[in-house]
């Protein structure tokens, strides 16, 4: 399939070329030709090898590790498109790094998420498309439209097809800040929710307990970012002690930083489900399964280009089984 409108162009930078290629296949828009290289001193240079004049440009780039290299590559690409007279510049950032720095937790801390938003806008971006951004309020840091796609519909469809729904399943927030996400998935699965909390402060996460009844239930732990694996590991131990029969874990973004696999392999989690928003070179647990967000992002890209609403992609409809 080839998309009929030649005014839409799709470019992939270096953070996640595999995901960009899948998006290209689903949209029917071939990836544009460009070269991006890094000099010995770390400077990045980009050269687009085709015209973008009066075109609607979509640039696919997660700001994942190495975060700053990928962020600067994106900024330079935006500037290149702007100077080459692109009609619109739309950045597709499946994983938006720095979103966790959305407030001042202690005195004299920066709000780096706002700084990054300003840099992207100043470089010349007209719109941002992202996937389950860590803090939804970060959307307000941008002076351009932001489309934040929620991953819960993807996960819900997967679990329903796997038979994980209904009264035998309970969706658990592994920390008290994740209640809204857990409730959203539970609504799709027609299941109850529970929360893992800790008697001590959230940082130490000791003396954990469950608010809710997980005894004899199949537990699905849900979070947005899987980084060190500690949050899932601690929660898995708590729900196992509370009588969970099976434990699953799901996260939108699988960063799997160094040592995460070792942490997760020590606990009894049957399957860890993540999207392909991030590429990591670190070792991952053997029970990790990837669920591609490419078709989801591709549909959003076409809707944006055609001026159609994006919200129908994640509207909740009670499944008919």
Curated annotation (Swiss-Prot):
Binding positions (ATP): 41-43, 100-101
Alphabetized SMART domains for the sequence: Pribosyltran_N
Enzyme class: transferase
Cellular component terms per the entry's GO annotation: cytoplasm; ribose phosphate diphosphokinase complex
Catalyzed chemical reaction(s): D-ribose 5-phosphate + ATP = 5-phospho-alpha-D-ribose 1-diphosphate + AMP + H(+)
Cofactor note: Binds 1 Mg(2+) ion per subunit.
Binding site for Mg(2+): 134
Pathway in which the depicted protein is active: Metabolic intermediate biosynthesis; 5-phospho-alpha-D-ribose 1-diphosphate biosynthesis; 5-phospho-alpha-D-ribose 1-diphosphate from D-ribose 5-phosphate (route I): step 1/1
InterPro entries named among the record's database cross-references: PRib_PP_synth_CS (IPR000842), Pribosyltran_N (IPR029099), PRibTrfase_dom (IPR000836), PRTase-like (IPR029057), Rib-P_diPkinase (IPR005946), Rib-P_diPkinase_bac (IPR037515)
Pfam families in UniProt: Pribosyl_synth, Pribosyltran_N
Assembly description: Homohexamer.
Biological role: Involved in the biosynthesis of the central metabolite phospho-alpha-D-ribosyl-1-pyrophosphate (PRPP) via the transfer of pyrophosphoryl group from ATP to 1-hydroxyl of ribose-5-phosphate (Rib-5-P).
The family this protein is said to belong to: Belongs to the ribose-phosphate pyrophosphokinase family. Class I subfamily.
Name of the featured protein: Putative ribose-phosphate pyrophosphokinase 2
């Amino acid at each position: 399939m080839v998309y009929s409108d030649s005014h839409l162009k799709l470019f992939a930078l270096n953070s996640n070329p595999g995901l960009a290629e899948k998006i290209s296949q689903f949209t029917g828009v071939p990836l544009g030709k460009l070269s991006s290289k890094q000099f010995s001193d770390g400077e990045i240079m980009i050269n687009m090898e085709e015209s973008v004049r009066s075109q609607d440009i979509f640039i696919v780039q997660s700001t994942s590790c190495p975060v700053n290299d990928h962020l600067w590559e994106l900024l330079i690409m935006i500037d290149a498109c702007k100077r080459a007279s692109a009609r619109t510049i739309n950045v597709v950032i499946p994983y938006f790094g720095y979103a966790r720095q959305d407030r001042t937790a202690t005195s004299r801390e920066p709000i780096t998420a706002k700084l990054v938003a300003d840099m992207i806008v100043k470089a010349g971006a007209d719109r941002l498309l992202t996937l389950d951004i860590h803090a939804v309020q970060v959307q307000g840091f941008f002076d351009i439209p932001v489309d934040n796609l929620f991953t819960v519909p993807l996960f819900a469809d997967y679990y329903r097809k796997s038979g994980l729904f209904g009264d035998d399943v309970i969706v658990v927030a592994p920390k008290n800040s994740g209640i809204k996400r857990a409730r959203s998935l539970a609504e799709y699965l027609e299941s109850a929710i529970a929360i893992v909390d800790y008697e001590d402060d959230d940082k130490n996460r000791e003396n954990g307990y469950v608010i809710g009844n997980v005894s004899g239930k199949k537990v699905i732990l849900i979070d947005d970012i899987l980084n060190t694996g500690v949050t899932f590991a601690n929660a898995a131990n708590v729900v196992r002690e509370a009588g969970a029969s099976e434990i699953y874990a799901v996260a939108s973004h699988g960063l799997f930083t160094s040592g995460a696999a070792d942490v997760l392999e020590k606990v009894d989690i049957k399957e860890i489900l993540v999207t392909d928003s991030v590429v990591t070179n670190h070792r991952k647990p053997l029970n990790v399964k990837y669920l591609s967000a490419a078709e989801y992002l591709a549909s959003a890209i076409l809707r944006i280009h055609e001026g159609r609403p994006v919200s129908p992609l994640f509207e909740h409809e009670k499944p008919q089984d």
